[in-house]
């Protein structure tokens, strides 16, 4: 009962959530989703499987993924596969892409959903700051390597889509934890007017001189690093949409909402200040099911099939930070990304 009330309250608070209600058959379609074993990714996979697609779960934890795979297949009766993917390892990303290239004839929809948020300072296996390494660089490499499979989807008459899950956090915060919770509170309690808050802050930008917080000891701030990784998502989606337009691939970027999911795990440890400060907000957060709605909308909605390079929130076009629309920054991030993951122009 409480979950039902929360769902209704969330729908009123956050606006329309119509992704699951899209009447479309995905019979015969192949949809790959990163981080599909938990939270928003799990709900996205479940709903897409219900519409007839064969879902490929790209997950680091294959044990948890297997349990979810069985759950989805039991409910929908449709095939669900698992391919191991650790986005914090470029070697794992390449291995995943190689497996898919050998096994699959095509991929119709790719949803870059997985992510890590506001974690303590850590590095990927390649020495990158963990959040931008996982949320951006890992997905950048995966998307580039899977483009041949996505292009093959066009031969079936289908318009392939790439969905990039970002966050409104790409606009900030400039302030470190715990002040970032001020933004969270305003976003939850006044979602219709949250832009006013962001307008009061200096424009958040990529730290081009030190993307990985290595030059100044102690400069790492979890929420600033997260915001940077989410801004990278939007910049990437913008530039990607231009580069794949000639191939007939459409690109969508989105803010899923503030969601009560495992993303908060680093701040919900029992007895921590984060757990104490988050407690009043949890009821106002979207459930993972509601958080999946805009991903589903971008992946499935027929009326936006000719749109590409736009940013969405609550199943509607929204305005990203003006910084994300800077074409020089889009190109700069692309060059840095190619160098970081070891892709030359002739490889892409």
For each predicted feature, which ranges?
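Low-complexity, intrinsically disordered, cysteine-poor segments enriched in small/polar
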Residues: 4, 8, 276-279, 283
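Rossmann-fold NAD(P)H-dependent dehydrogenase/reductase core
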Residues: 4-272, 340-348
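Pocket-edge positions in alpha/beta enzyme catalytic cores
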Residues: 57, 85, 283, 322-325
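C-terminal helical subdomain
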Residues: 93, 229, 278-318, 325-329
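Short, active-site-adjacent cap segments at secondary-structure transitions
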Residues: 117, 318-319
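Generic recognition of well-ordered alpha-helical segments
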Residues: 239, 294-297, 336
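A catalytic-pocket lid/entrance helix-loop region that shapes and gates access to the active site
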Residues: 271-274, 333
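C-terminal amphipathic/interface module of NAD(P)-dependent oxidoreductases
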Residues: 322-348
């Amino acid at each position: 009962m409480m979950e039902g009330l929360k769902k209704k309250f969330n729908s009123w608070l956050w606006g329309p959530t119509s992704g699951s209600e899209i009447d479309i058959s995905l019979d015969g379609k192949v949809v790959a989703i990163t981080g599909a074993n938990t939270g928003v990714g799990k709900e996205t996979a479940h709903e897409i499987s219900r519409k007839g697609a064969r879902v490929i779960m790209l997950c680091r934890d294959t044990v948890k993924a297997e349990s979810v795979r069985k759950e989805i297949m039991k409910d929908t009766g449709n095939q669900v596969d698992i391919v191991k993917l650790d986005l914090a390892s470029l070697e794992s990303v390449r291995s995943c892409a190689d497996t898919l290239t050998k096994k699959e004839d095509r991929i119709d929809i790719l949803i870059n959903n997985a992510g890590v948020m506001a974690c303590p300072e850590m590095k990927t296996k390649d020495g990158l700051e963990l959040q931008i390494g996982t949320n951006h660089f890992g997905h950048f490499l995966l998307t580039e390597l899977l483009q041949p499979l996505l292009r093959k989807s066009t031969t079936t008459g289908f318009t392939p889509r790439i969905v990039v899950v970002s966050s409104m956090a790409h606009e900030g915060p400039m302030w470190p934890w715990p002040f970032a919770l001020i933004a969270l509170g305003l976003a939850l309690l006044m979602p219709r007017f949250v832009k006013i808050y962001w307008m009061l802050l200096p424009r958040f930008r990529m730290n081009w001189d030190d993307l990985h917080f290595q030059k100044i000891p102690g400069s790492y701030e979890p929420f600033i690093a997260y915001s940077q990784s989410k801004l990278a998502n939007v910049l990437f989606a913008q530039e990607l949409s231009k580069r794949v337009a000639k191939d007939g691939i459409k690109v969508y970027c989105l803010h899923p909402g503030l969601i009560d999911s495992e993303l908060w795990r680093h701040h919900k440890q029992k007895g921590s200040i984060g757990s104490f400060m988050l407690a009043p907000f949890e009821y106002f957060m979207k459930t993972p099911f509601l958080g999946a709605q805009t991903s589903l909308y971008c992946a499935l909605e027929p009326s936006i099939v000719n749109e590409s390079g736009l940013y969405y929130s609550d199943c509607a076009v929204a305005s990203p930070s003006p910084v994300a629309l800077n074409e020089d920054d889009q190109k700069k991030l692309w060059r840095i990304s190619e160098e970081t993951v070891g892709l030359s122009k002739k490889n892409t």
